[in-house]
Amino acid sequence: MDTAPPRPQGNPVVRLPVARRPIVQRITLPSLAAVGGADSLALGALTLFLTGFGLVMVLSASSVESGVAGDPFSSFATQGVAALVGAGGMLAIATRLRTAWLPRLAPIVFFSAVAVQLLTALTPLGTSIGGNQNWIRLGALSVQPSEFVKLGLVLVLAAFFSRRPGELLGVRGMLPPVAFTATAIGAVYLGHDLGTCLILALIGFGGFLMSNVRLPVLVLLGGSATVVLLLFSQGNGSRTSRLAAWSNGCTDLLGTCWQTTQAQWALANGGLTGVGIGNSVSKWFWLPEADNDFIGAIIGEETGLLGLAVLLGCFVAMAVVLLRISTRTQDRFTRAAAGMALAWLVGQAFANIAVVVGVAPVFGVPLPFVSAGGSSLLANLAVVGCMMALADRPVTVATTTSIVDPDHPAARGRAVGIR
């Protein structure tokens, strides 16, 4: 007698094994041409132009100081390596990164960067340059972890804003993103870098703004951040003296205002069309930080007002592209991340130029993509790569609140990438 169990009726269910998809797909030559959106292409082109222009200006601005040290191409070579590595990484992120992983990677990137920054600021591993203990020496290279704290803050705030939009309607819901921002600012402030603290506050403000936080809350957050940063500026003698000199009209031309004065003289010497690339006078030890925070003055001197206008025009165009990416998407992660990238890159660029022309006190922030500094360039290119990827392949994140956004893809029955 056959005792086998009866076979079920209907079509049998076949379960196929599901392979885990890697974070980054294999890079091939066709994949490098996969960036097809107009916004991502425009953003990549602007970034590569600014990076290439920055290499030329770093070579010019650093040639005198590097030449006295024995190698006129040393700063240029270091910047060139960072540019090649960073541009390759940017293209890899833009074309092959699975953006669904970005919210998952965000806490890892953020807390790792903050941890390394704390080690830099509080232990002998850190190296002090110009009064800021913000660098770790790795052989012949110096790494600035605070630049990667900016990248981590962009990602972790975007992840929070995308998952819990409804919670931002209450005061308790504001505490986590404020805590993330305060943690980043506090870790960097321990290294005495007020300029980076200002940019981190700007990034946080950009995230709240693009996440539709109410205007009174934005005003409260902005006012609180301003008060805190002013208090921070009083904790260092040189910062206090620079702020006081600027607020009093900067009359100490040979002392506290020397750097600002030399920058303005460089711009005046450049006039409308400049003295020609390589022909700057100010870089001959008149202007401190000529290849870094004050490279804008060398650009104005060598390429004139027209060259500086083209540079600022590129950043305005970048702002337009990032704003398009942020406002044309229904994905909350992309919206918040693009808004914070705009606040970081474009806001920092105009803050740098404001210092150069004397309308803001000297607080030390580099010109994105242009100033010498490998860590800054790598972080800038990494965030642009993320924005290019998100412009083409937005992340869709399910919210955990009871508030349903009818414009959200999940509300219309679309697939949700992360649950």
Where are the predicted features?
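A juxtamembrane structural motif centered on a specific transmembrane helix
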Residues: 1-25, 29-30, 350-419
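N-terminal membrane topogenic signal
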Residues: 31-47
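Helix-boundary and loop/linker segments of multi-pass membrane transporters
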Residues: 33-37, 169-174, 284-287, 329-330
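Hydrophobic alpha-helical transmembrane segments of multi-pass inner membrane proteins, especially
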Residues: 44-60, 65-259, 297-358, 382-386, ...
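Glycine/serine-rich anion-binding loops at beta->alpha junctions
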Residues: 139-149, 190-192, 271-276, 365-377
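Transmembrane helix boundary and interhelical junction motifs in multipass membrane proteins
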Residues: 193-198, 275-280, 290-292, 309, ...
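Extracytosolic (periplasmic/ER-lumenal) interhelical loops and adjacent juxtamembrane/interface segments
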Residues: 257-278
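Long extracytoplasmic/lumenal interhelical loops at the membrane interface
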Residues: 271-306, 329
